[in-house]
Curated annotation (Swiss-Prot):
Alphabetical keyword list: Ribonucleoprotein, Ribosomal protein
InterPro entries xref list: Ribo_uL30_ferredoxin-like_sf, Ribosomal_uL30_bac-type, Ribosomal_uL30_CS, Ribosomal_uL30_ferredoxin-like
Organism: Pseudoalteromonas translucida (strain TAC 125)
GO cellular component: cytosolic large ribosomal subunit
Family assignment from sequence similarity: Belongs to the universal ribosomal protein uL30 family.
Xref: Gene3D superfamilies: Ribosomal protein L30, ferredoxin-like fold domain
GO molecular function list: structural constituent of ribosome
Protein name per Swiss-Prot or TrEMBL: Large ribosomal subunit protein uL30
CDD domains in the cross-refs: Ribosomal_L30
Subunit structure, as described in the record: Part of the 50S ribosomal subunit.
Signal peptide: none
GO biological process annotation, one example: translation
Pfam family, one: Ribosomal_L30
Keyword Lipid biosynthesis among UniProt keywords: no
Length: 60
């Protein structure tokens, strides 16, 4: 069975955000606005997305 994936796109800037949230974006592999990455849909990744949900858009 194929692993589930989720597409995450950064839609807001990380300038002026908490250092922890900037680090979370880097951990997700996001570098700039409109940058999209495809990640495995795991509890760890979902937790990171939840932490920076105000800066990202999630599909899938």
């Amino acid at each position: 069975m194929a692993n589930q994936t989720v597409k995450v796109t950064q839609v807001k800037s990380s300038i002026g955000r908490l250092p922890k949230h900037k680090a979370t974006l880097r951990g997700l592999g996001l570098r700039r606005i409109n940058h999209t990455v495809e990640l495995e849909d795991t509890a760890c990744v979902r937790g990171m997305i939840n932490q920076v949900s105000y800066m990202v858009k999630v599909e899938g």
